Amino acid sequence: VKECLEPAASARNVTIELSGDSFTVRAAYKHIYELVENIVSNAIKYNKDGGRVEITLHDVGETGCIYVRDNGIGIPKESLNRVFERFYRVDKGRSTKEGSTGLGLSIVKHIVNCYGGTVTLDSELGKGTLVCVRLPIAKNISE
């Protein structure tokens, strides 16, 4: 995902950093790809010039955690409980300009729920956003 989104990040002068543990989750590759792509794409779109997106992976026992943190524009507190709703856009003017449909985070939530995981989002207006996805780790490759 990082390599695919580098051109979009570069066009906005946003740096993507990847770190952490390697793990395998019980999920289809295409779903995990779509999940991470949606989150990172938002982190790039709603960032500032010279911004940063950090993708951190952690193997925490039976759970794989994917953290995506940005130092972008953030989300107002009153919108936090609605961002996973289909077609919800925090700033309709900016979202339209950015080509947003308001489906990205609802797709993320759906994928995570299908695989028995959780997704949380914390944000501060003007400071950035942290998205945390937790999914069950596959104990062996046949899972």
Model regions and ranges:
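Glycine-rich G1-box
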Residues: 7, 73-74
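Conserved micro-motifs of the catalytic ATP-binding
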Residues: 20, 24-31
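Short helix-loop "hinge" at the ATP-lid/N-box region of the Bergerat-fold HATPase_c
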Residues: 43-44
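Short beta-strand/loop element within the Bergerat-fold HATPase_c
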Residues: 50-62
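Acidic ATP/Mg2+-coordinating residue in the GHKL
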Residues: 70
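Short conserved segment of the HATPase_c
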Residues: 75-89, 109
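Conserved glycine-rich
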Residues: 116-117
